[in-house]
Amino acid sequence: MKMKLVNCTEQYWEFVRKLRMNPINQEGFFTYAEITSEQQESYMLKNQWDYKICLVDGEPAGYVGLLKGHEITYCVSPDFQGKGVGTFMIEEFSPRWAWVDALVKVDNIASQKVFEKLGWKKQIYYRNK
């Protein structure tokens, strides 16, 4: 598998929206999201340079980005989960920023493992009610 990060140009905005709203992926986020195409376009027009798309053999497999200027967010397509895509994205993306945080749900073990594998230090996990 050949992986690379590319800019999150307009051709990928709908991919990001659908991936974020995928019921399998919703469990990994703190908030449930219902995002319209119009909302996605508006958001990405302002924030597209804070996001990258991971291509695996040329196919979009996930995204990684920065929220609030310091909070890393990422999501992997269910078809590519467990194949190192999340680890690759965090490893490639995070050196771009001097300081970033990762907020991970206490029950999101897969994401915890990604960050710990890359040497991130656990501070605290919040429990979503």
What name fits each language-model region?
Residues G82-P95, I109-K117:
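Conserved acetyl-CoA-binding loop-helix of GNAT-fold acetyltransferases
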Residues D50-L67:
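Conserved beta-hairpin
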Residues I24-S42:
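Conserved GNAT-fold acetyl-CoA-binding loop/helix
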Residues L103, K121-K129:
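Conserved catalytic-core motifs of GNAT/GCN5-like acyltransferases
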Residues V64-L67, L103, V114:
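Long, contiguous binding/interaction regions
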Residues K2-K18:
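A short beta-loop-alpha structural element at the N-terminal edge
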Residues R96-D107:
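Conserved GNAT acetyl-CoA-binding A-motif
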Residues L55, E71-V85, V104-K105:
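A short, internal acetyl-CoA/4′-phosphopantetheine-binding micro-motif in the GNAT/acyltransferase core
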